[in-house]
């Protein structure tokens, strides 16, 4: 079962667990909840178990928002050390394509959305060949080809990972609902904003500007 913007449950338990992080979180916890960032799937992998906060009665796994917030902050710091033009962000998933494109536009990165052409990272004669220093993927399952190529040439991989994702070839995980429209736009916006803050460059975008109209 995919996690979408529908069926978002904001529970008293989740809110209570987040109270202690409210003052230091990148956005108010309610914004994470409203966007459904915490909503996982009815499947979980061993890799993602440490990021799971609880299991709902309907079998849906709920992600720990504090972990998401902390990971966005630390990974933004990591990414800020790279030349933005050497950062590649990809998304085969439809709802991730517009946020990924806006991320690249706002920080000066490169985006490849939609179908990823095999060989784009490994074949120098391939049209559209690019040698990034780091890759960001929206979903390790949908963007598996990108990850395979990045691993083959030794490029670190940052991935937005849901409860059902395998992370064996991912270097840095951002635990999040990576299927919902609002969740993806908020996470990509926060990541871009924090990179801009780390690099001390202007960032004049609202979260709503990262949300696809589809």
From Swiss-Prot:
Keywords: Ribonucleoprotein, Ribosomal protein
Pfam family, one: Ribosomal_S2
UniProt xrefs under InterPro entries: Ribosomal_uS2, Ribosomal_uS2_arc, Ribosomal_uS2_CS, Ribosomal_uS2_euk/arc, Ribosomal_uS2_flav_dom_sf
Protein name per Swiss-Prot or TrEMBL: Small ribosomal subunit protein uS2
Native organism taxonomy: Archaea, Methanobacteriati, Methanobacteriota, Stenosarchaea group, Methanomicrobia
Sequence similarity: Belongs to the universal ribosomal protein uS2 family.
Source domain of life: Archaea
GO cellular component: small ribosomal subunit
Any one biological process term the GO annotation gives: translation
Originating species: Methanococcoides burtonii (strain DSM 6242 / NBRC 107633 / OCM 468 / ACE-M)
GO molecular function: structural constituent of ribosome
């Amino acid at each position: 079962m995919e996690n979408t913007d529908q069926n978002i449950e904001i529970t008293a338990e989740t809110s209570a667990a987040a109270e202690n992080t409210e003052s230091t979180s990148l956005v108010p916890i309610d914004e994470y909840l409203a966007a459904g960032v915490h909503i996982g799937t009815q499947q979980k992998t061993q890799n993602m178990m440490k990021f799971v906060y609880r299991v709902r009665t309907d079998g849906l796994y709920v992600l720990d928002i504090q972990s998401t917030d902390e990971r966005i902050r630390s990974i933004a710091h990591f990414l800020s050390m790279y030349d933005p033009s050497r950062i590649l962000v990809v998304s085969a998933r439809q709802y991730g394509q517009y946020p990924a494109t806006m991320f690249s536009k706002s920080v000066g990165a490169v985006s490849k959305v939609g179908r990823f052409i095999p060989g784009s990272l490994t074949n120098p004669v391939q049209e559209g060949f690019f040698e990034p220093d780091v890759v960001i993927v929206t979903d390790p399952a949908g963007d598996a080809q990108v990850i395979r190529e990045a691993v083959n040439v030794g490029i670190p991989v940052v991935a937005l990972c849901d409860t059902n994702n395998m992370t064996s070839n991912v270097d840095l995980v951002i635990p999040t609902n990576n299927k919902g429209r609002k969740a993806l736009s908020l996470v990509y916006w926060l990541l871009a904003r924090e990179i801009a803050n780390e690099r001390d460059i202007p960032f004049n975008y609202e979260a709503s500007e990262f949300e696809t109209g589809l």
